[in-house]
Amino acid sequence: MPLTGGGHRAKLLPVLAMPSTQTAPAAPPPWLAAAASLGVGLALLACYWCTLAPSFTGRDGGELAAAVHVMGVAHPTGYPLYLVLGKLFDLLPLGEPARCLAFFSAVSAAGAGALLCWVAIALTGYPLAGVLAGLAAGLSSWVWGVANQAEVYALNLLLVVLALAAFVRWQAAPAPRRLYLLAAAAGLGLAHHRTSLFFTAPLLLWALWATRPRPLRLLAATTGWACLPLLLYLWLPVRSACHPPLNWGNTSGSWLWFWEHINGSLYLAFVLRTGAAAVISQVGAWGAALGRQLGLAGVLLIAIGLVGMLRSRHRPLGVLLLASTALYLLWAGSYRVADRQVFAIPVMIPLGLWCGLGLAHALAGLPRLKLSPALLRLVPLAGGLVALALPANLSLQHWARLDRSRDHRPLEQALLNLAGVPGDAVVLLEGDEPNAGAEYYYHALGRRPLPLLLPTEWAVYDWAYPLLPAWLRPALARAAPLPEREFMEWLPYYLREVLDPRRPLYTNLDAPRVPPGFVLLKDHALKRLVLPPGLPLAADRPRMRPVTELPQGSGWLLGVQVPPVLARGAPFPIRLAVRLQRPLPDGWDLQLLFLQGASPSPGGAVMVPRDQVFARRVPLLFGLALPATPPGRHYQQDLFGLPSRRLRPGAYQLYLQFCRGRHRTAPVPLAATVTLR
């Protein structure tokens, strides 16, 4: 395909946009591609090893290390493949369990870089292109940042590149066996991290669409190979049934709990929670940061590689990689969490690949510029310098910032919090990092004595009730109807009431409520609710009584309109019409309760039969704050609610209740029943 133009622009066009009729260079010997890939993997592993974290690094790292060490169940989606493979690395004599899992991450990320090097060589025929692709991706700050700590993202990266390598092999010589390998790689990715579908699903669907003919037997076999790795999720209920110390989701207790755990419904509330402008701004900030890391040369090589791929016989793969990149950026940019960039880490795979392809296109296009023979002999040397200079620049930029080899701060904080806590204590912790530190301190390191650990986030889930001691459940049941802010504030109060006064209660809550007679002491970095000597025991002290000062009866409620049949998780309207006989005192709220299998007692509490173990008790779904309405006036409010998907199908009775803080009036049953299905 001739390219027209004059001057320097005509000379540069062969480099920036290679013609689609260009023949691929001869493939290098297999041993050379293997040696280049092995060298890239070892170089990356050496960098990761020198900056490897000696302990857990906070947040999910401590929990994952504890779950692997005790063979428990991690937070949604469970990560069964990580738990199984991580246990093999946990047996290595490398020090703490978190360090062993950090080495697992390093091996996974280094393997991903080596595989990416092989893919680039297979696509271009240039070993230097593979070296640059693997090192540019592996030494980026995003990949390096998760390759030297105990996290799940490095293994996700390896599985994504494995699927890409399987697709390239199938593309070179389409055959059913290679298609099955691609399907199995896609299934392994889904058995670990659900976002791998953004990368593997387009590749697998394109391979199926491009296969001619497509007999039913081929489709069935491909589907079977893709679904076979998903059987790993059965590991979660099997281990949950063994009652490990760390049992997120209680997946053996109910198929509904198992399904909610593996599909990550808990985190769906964070997805697509930012506007289009915020997503564009976030993606732009990430692009600017990566551009500063790679420099002008790296950005130019990526552009050349992308344009060259779209103009070559590998155009379908280029389009698929562009689509995967867009999906990852949309997902990560719209995810409302602080460290959202970790979900966009697989984007470095196509960027690194395009960088390597850009070098290959530049090396192939330079001879077309009619350079002198002396300069042409320097082309391989120049390519080698670029392939090494860009990764060297990346390593110099990130080494000091990403070096975790001396980072003991999370473990030191856990030691400061928990050292000296007696074995009969109850430890109530709020926040991911404090809970991860406690789980790692006691379950991974095996520190004793072991107190009762109670993460506040567990207390709001129905699957957690069967895992808790029976004497603890009433306290959580009383706090469950409260809004989240008040729940955190009053939970220590209710726990303190059911505890033996001599049993210490530790918490890191900022402002917990202190029961009468107790004092709040600062013990290390935690607060301790204690009963000073000489005061009466809990059995001798008056219990908290519900306040019944507000009148109840037909004068309060005029009517309620609720659809008779609702679908779980689907929004629906509720209309309340209230007549106030006198102004509502400041601070009082009107709450609507959905209860199943429960009946109000004369004392005002909601009694739940023990055989239901609180699984059928439904927390407060709606809170309606009433203003100081003049007496005799009507107040009408339209509520737009969303019933929890965790509610079991069946009939629910509606109750009305006035509350202020811990004070409750007796629930008033409404003439309305809702059926969830």
Give the residues covered by each predicted segment:
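Perimembrane helix-loop-helix junctions
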Residues: 169-172, 198-227
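Membrane-interface transmembrane helices that cradle and orient dolichyl/undecaprenyl
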Residues: 121-127, 147, 163-179, 189, ...
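C-terminal luminal/periplasmic domains and tails of membrane-associated envelope-modifying transferases
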Residues: 11, 418-424, 445-677
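Hydrophobic, aromatic-rich transmembrane alpha-helices
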Residues: 291-315
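Signature aromatic-anchored transmembrane alpha helix within multi-pass, membrane-resident enzymes
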Residues: 310-315, 357-396
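Transmembrane-helix signature of polytopic, membrane-embedded enzymes
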Residues: 34-42, 116-139, 158, 177, ...
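Hydrophobic/aromatic-rich transmembrane helices and adjacent perimembrane loops
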Residues: 198, 319-322, 330-366
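Transmembrane-helix motifs of polytopic, lipid-linked glycan transferases
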Residues: 38, 42, 103-124, 159-166, ...
